[in-house]
Amino acid sequence: MTIKIRSEETCTESKFFYHNQDVTYNYHLDMVDNGINIWTSIHGKNAGLLPFVFQSFQISSEEDAISFYKYVKLIGTGCYVAILISGNLPYHSKRITKAMKLVGGGSKSIETLSDSNPNFCLIGYKGQKIGSARQAIGDADIEEEGGISVWMMTTKNRCLFKNRILINLRNKTPLGTISQLYKKHIKKEMTNNIYL
């Protein structure tokens, strides 16, 4: 499963590929600009073709920030999470930073998000050590497609951590390289940090 997300000045669009077949119009996601888009992995037989749950949050007040924090707090320990902010958030709150820390985010990256330094991505899992999630901020010299790619990788093993999500800001990393990254880093990390 490959999820390709392109962010441009006018809109943010997502493309879904399953075995290189575009299944975008089979699944509609209401992604938001200048808000928080979050994917959470689903485990079990009911995972379906796209084994994740998607939710978006417009953050314009402390109440919105609290709502996002509560959502992240309810995610099951060990579940993988991908977070995308296209643009800047109109409202910044310590609750958002606390929510990011629940999935391994560090405070420095999200706190530097601004109109002059937009776009934020995070890949982590619930219960991950603070600051150890993979994070990226800014445009990162995006070329060609000009977007952010999110890959959902599913292992063949039936285990608690079935789904793997990786984010690449530059659209230059081939899937093979991501597989190698999984084998070298993610798998080792998951072996050392199993939450039941």
From Swiss-Prot:
Pfam families xrefs: ILEI
Membrane topology (UniProt): Single-pass membrane protein
Segments passing through the bilayer: 71-87
Cited InterPro entries: ILEI/PANDER_dom (IPR039477)
Subcellular location: Membrane
Primary localisation category: membrane
Gene Ontology CC terms: membrane
Keywords from the named record: Membrane, Transmembrane, Transmembrane helix
Protein name: Putative uncharacterized transmembrane protein DDB_G0285347
